[in-house]
Regions:
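C-terminal subregions of glycosyltransferases and related glycan-biosynthesis enzymes
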Residues: 208, 212-267
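Glycine-rich, basic loop-to-helix element that forms the pyrophosphate-binding segment
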Residues: 66-82, 95
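Short aromatic/hydrophobic "clamp" motif used to bind/position activated sugar donors
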Residues: 87
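A conserved acidic beta->alpha catalytic loop
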Residues: 25, 40-50, 67-69
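Acidic helix N-cap motif at the loop->helix transition within catalytic regions
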Residues: 20, 45-53, 95, 99
Length: 267
């Protein structure tokens, strides 16, 4: 089996307490053909020196230091400087199972799919819970994935970037980027755009990513109702475009509207 280059992107902002563990989990991957992009987003702690220390001992690591501009701009800059056949994203508070990249790449190569979606563990203190929906099996078509997506439209499993493997050629050919004006659901918007241009999707039932619940993060706090409504309203055109492109918009329009309305009901 071939070993294509995988670019692992880590956006970093004031992540010193957990950063070494995150980087070590990437360095110790059993899949070794990696380009590791550590992108410091103007951290005010010792995150940058930690990155520089690891870059001195691992030639696969490239450290990029930028003025603070937000996670979306940081990811976009890394995407534009990545060289891998595939892209993988890791948040600096989290860590990977040692087999994470190997399993993602093996699944991608054996199925020739455009995206691999893996289960993950949510870590809350000493408690770990596995999250995910899809079962391993034949690749899903674009239409199949779109149907599954609306069963759990607000889930991290479909929405985030860090439990997935992406073909970089699709991202580059269609200039897919994170929306730098959004501070919530920017991952989901990126994925909706990617799904528009990808043809096949497969699942990995093994949990390969450990997501550390952070009570100070925007994803762990109660999002302001007005902002949540604004964000979901801005997502609507992308939903409509995706489901129109694949001929499912009229069929799934009620579910899409229900997802938008649920913000007001549950926020």
């Amino acid at each position: 089996m071939s070993t294509p280059l995988v670019s692992i992107v880590v956006p970093i902002y004031n992540a010193a307490p957990n950063l070494a563990g995150c980087i070590q989990s990437i360095r110790k991957q059993r899949y070794e053909n990696l380009e590791i992009l550590l992108v410091n987003d103007g951290s005010e702690d010792v995150s940058l020196p930690i990155c520089d220390m690891y870059a001195r001992i691992d030639p696969r690591i490239t450290v990029i230091n930028r003025p603070n501009s937000g996670v979306s701009a940081t990811r976009n800059y890394a995407i534009e400087h990545a060289h891998g056949d595939y892209l993988q994203f890791v948040d600096s508070d989290d860590w990977l199972d040692r087999n994470a990249t190997r399993l993602l790449v093996e699944r991608a190569l054996e199925t020739d799919c455009d995206m691999v979606i893996a289960r993950y563990c949510r870590v809350d203190g000493e408690k770990q819970t596995v999250h995910g929906f899809l079962s391993e099996g034949p690749c899903l078509s674009q239409r199949d994935l779109a149907r599954h997506l609306l069963e759990e439209p607000a889930s991290f499993y479909y929405g985030v970037m860090w439990n997935k493997l992406y073909r970089r050629s699709i991202i580059e050919n269609h200039h897919i980027r994170c929306n730098e004006e959004m501070t919530w659901s920017e991952d989901f918007l990126f994925n909706l755009e990617y799904i528009r241009y990808a043809n096949s999707f497969c699942a990995l039932e093994t949990p390969i990513y450990y997501y550390r619940k952070n009570n100070k993060s925007i994803t762990a706090t109660k999002v302001n109702l007005l902002n949540a409504v604004k964000v979901k309203t801005s997502l609507f055109p992308y939903y409509k475009q995706l489901y129109t492109d694949i001929g499912l918009y009229e069929q799934f329009k009620p579910q899409i509207y229900r997802y938008l309305v649920s913000t007001a009901e549950h926020s």
